[in-house]
Swiss-Prot record:
UniProt entry keywords in alphabetical sequence: Developmental protein, mRNA processing, Phosphoprotein, RNA-binding
Biased composition (Basic and acidic residues): 68-83, 213-229
UniProt function note: Involved in histone pre-mRNA 3' processing and couples histone mRNA production with the cell cycle. Both maternal and zygotic proteins play an essential and vital function for development.
Modification Phosphotyrosine occurs at: Y177
Biased composition range(s): Low complexity: 18-29, 53-67, 121-146, 176-188
Gene Ontology BP terms: mitotic chromosome condensation; mRNA 3'-end processing by stem-loop binding and cleavage; mRNA transport
Subunit structure: Interacts with Sym and Cpsf73.
Residues recorded with modification Phosphothreonine: T120
Region: RNA-binding, residue numbers: 191-260
Organism in which the protein naturally occurs: Drosophila melanogaster
Residue(s) carrying Phosphoserine: S24, S29, S118, S123, S127, S131, S182
A single MF term (Gene Ontology): mRNA binding
Record-given protein name: Histone RNA hairpin-binding protein
Length: 276
């Protein structure tokens, strides 16, 4: 009846790609679609690429990988071989010396003195006294040089002599203790404005009670270097230097300042107390 009409029939022979599922109540047949080979093959099939192209790409990638491996292996071998290498440097100083001498002989290069190495002994030809910049000529150097070779004492004496000569060449500044007049007119001050200013400074220092007491206590014949001396206004000084001399002179005159009234009263009080 109704149950028999609704009964589903199941074929005995299963179709290709289909499966059957049996249960106690009823039997249901399920069809299964054929599976594709892979997702990549589907993409190639859509774009029209064949399996030959994919195989060629795979083979080219494999060949590139093998080449990279070979290159790394070769680099490792070269680095191992390079560890055993030795490098040698050769400095050609002699070539420069030969070139320098050739240029000097051809008069293409002129030097004030000849080059001499530190390990070669000094000689008359290689000595620096032959240079035009040296103070002593080669003849004077040969005459002054001792027979026994280089003497350090002679070198020191030469240096001291040159230093003294250089000091003598400098301008000599005459202070108030040397002499009132200089030996040369070039070292005397002749500007009337400067002389009048210096005279005012000297007069200002002399117009003090300390200078008057100094003249009374110490005559000119008994004065020594320790006593204050009036600065020489004719000396060749700068303005700052002469002002410094005047300052020192007036400071030394303060020793002869007269005692103040307070000191006198203190002395009187002390004398009265002693007498009592």
């Amino acid at each position: 009846m109704l149950c028999e009409d609704q009964h589903m029939s199941v074929e005995n022979t299963p179709q290709k790609g289909s499966g059957s599922l049996n249960s106690s109540a009823s039997s249901i047949s399920i069809d299964v679609k054929p599976t594709m080979q892979s997702w990549a093959q589907e993409v190639r099939a859509e774009f029209g690429h064949s399996d030959e192209a994919s195989s060629s790409l795979n083979s080219s990638a494999a060949s590139c990988g093998s080449l990279a491996k070979k290159e790394t292996a070769d680099g490792n071998l070269e680095s191992k071989d390079g560890e055993g290498r030795e490098m040698a440097f050769e400095f050609l100083d002699g070539v420069n010396e030969v070139k320098f001498e050739r240029l000097v002989k051809e008069e293409k290069l002129k030097t004030p003195y000849k080059r001499r190495h530190s390990f070669t002994p000094p000689s008359n030809e290689n000595s620096r006294s032959n240079s035009p910049n040296s103070s002593n000529s080669s003849a004077n150097g040969d005459a002054a040089a001792p027979k026994g070779g280089n003497n350090p004492h002679s070198r020191n004496s030469k240096k001291s002599g040159n230093f003294r000569a250089h000091k003598e060449e400098k301008r000599v500044r005459h202070n108030s203790y040397t002499s009132s007049t200089s030996s040369s007119s070039s070292y005397t001050e002749a500007d009337p404005a400067i002389l009048s200013r210096r005279q005012k400074q000297i007069d200002y220092g002399k117009n003090t009670a300390a200078y008057e007491r100094y003249v009374e206590m110490v005559p000119k014949d008994e004065r020594t270097r320790d006593h204050p001396r009036t600065p020489n206004k004719y000396g060749k000084y700068s303005r700052r230097a002469f002002d410094g001399l005047v300052k020192i002179w007036r400071k030394s005159l303060h020793i002869y300042d007269p005692p103040t009234q307070a000191r006198d009263t203190a002395k009187d009080s002390n004398s009265d107390s002693d007498s009592d």
